[in-house]
Amino acid sequence: MKPSKQILGLIGRNVGYSWSPLIHNTACELLGLPFIYTIFNIAEPQRLDDALRGARALGIAGFNVTIPYKQDVVPLLDHLAEEAASIRAVNTIVNIDGKLTGYNTDIEGFAAPLLSCRDSIAGMPVSVFGSGGASLAAIEAFRRYFKPSIIYLFVRDLFKAIRMLESYDHKETISICLIDDLHAGKNSTREHFGSSRVIVNATPIGTRGRTGDDVSCIVPLEKNLLHDSQIVYDMVYNPLRTPLLRAAELAGAKTITGIEMLIGQAARSFTLWTGEIMPVEEVRTQLIRHIETGT
């Protein structure tokens, strides 16, 4: 008789598109681990408390948490790991004997593909586009691992950015800039952008199948702004080569695809749940094949 499998899952809203089940189920199958990963779509934040009480009662081993609940789950947990407490956002929950601990593996996952460039980032400006949990994870990763001279946070909505940073303890590292000023040609914002060693798109704009704005409405794609002294990092992972990354390649910039962060944060979550090391290369191969074929 086969042992029963422990349940892992993703908490979010309208997240049927997620590749997380493929990533974690592939890793578990490769290592022969008794876990199965599924999706839990939660329609409204008022139901989060019920969902987590059910997880405690049912012994669900753990969760990832995604849009829009990374901050909403924080007060519902028993403990917060230090890195999650630093940005008051959780993307991973571990259940041990009914006690739920929240972690944020986005910070480490974001940093991983940049570590080889750490020395060239230290003391230089960087720019992050977006005012959600992903941008805050990038900001904290830069502060922890790379020590840039300043982090320019480019946003559309000034008040949303201020709210996002309300409980963040390191605001002195950040200068908020308006995207509209950048596109209007305001000299100071264009200088901030052009001087940045790293440019990060931490918005979902550019995702395959997403309707609405083109990424050029957020990040300028002009060749004279993107240049070969920059690293351009797009958190969007489908398609693999986003419009932003294609423009960056034409400008001679080094590029980093969102696949790297996706797998980096997943690998850390996987270890927290299972105690094992994810077979990253095999998982990456499977993931890229599925994204490229759309299956």
UniProtKB/Swiss-Prot annotation:
Catalytic activity annotation: shikimate + NADP(+) = 3-dehydroshikimate + NADPH + H(+)
EC number: 1.1.1.25
Keyword Phosphoprotein recorded: no
SUPFAM superfamilies reported for this sequence: Aminoacid dehydrogenase-like, N-terminal domain (SSF53223), NAD(P)-binding Rossmann-fold domains (SSF51735)
Classification via Pfam families: SDH_C, Shikimate_dh_N
UniProt keyword terms in alphabetical order: Amino-acid biosynthesis, Aromatic amino acid biosynthesis, NADP, Oxidoreductase
A GO biological-process term: aromatic amino acid family biosynthetic process
Cross-referenced InterPro entries: Aminoacid_DH-like_N_sf, NAD(P)-bd_dom_sf, SDH_C, Shikimate_DH, Shikimate_DH-bd_N, Shikimate_DH_fam
Gene3D superfamilies: Leucine Dehydrogenase, chain A, domain 1, NAD(P)-binding Rossmann-like Domain
Pathway connected to this protein: Metabolic intermediate biosynthesis; chorismate biosynthesis; chorismate from D-erythrose 4-phosphate and phosphoenolpyruvate: step 4/7
Molecular function per GO: NADP binding; shikimate 3-dehydrogenase (NADP+) activity
Binding site for shikimate: 18-20, 66, 91, 106, 237
Binding site for NADP(+): 82, 130-134, 235, 258
Family under the similarity heading: Belongs to the shikimate dehydrogenase family.
Function per UniProt: Involved in the biosynthesis of the chorismate, which leads to the biosynthesis of aromatic amino acids. Catalyzes the reversible NADPH linked reduction of 3-dehydroshikimate (DHSA) to yield shikimate (SA).
Assembly and interaction partners: Homodimer.
Stored HAMAP family: Shikimate_DH_AroE
Name used for this protein in its record: Shikimate dehydrogenase (NADP(+))
The organism of origin for this protein: Chlorobium limicola (strain DSM 245 / NBRC 103803 / 6330)
Organism phylogeny: Bacteria, Pseudomonadati, Chlorobiota, Chlorobiia, Chlorobiales
Originating gene: aroE
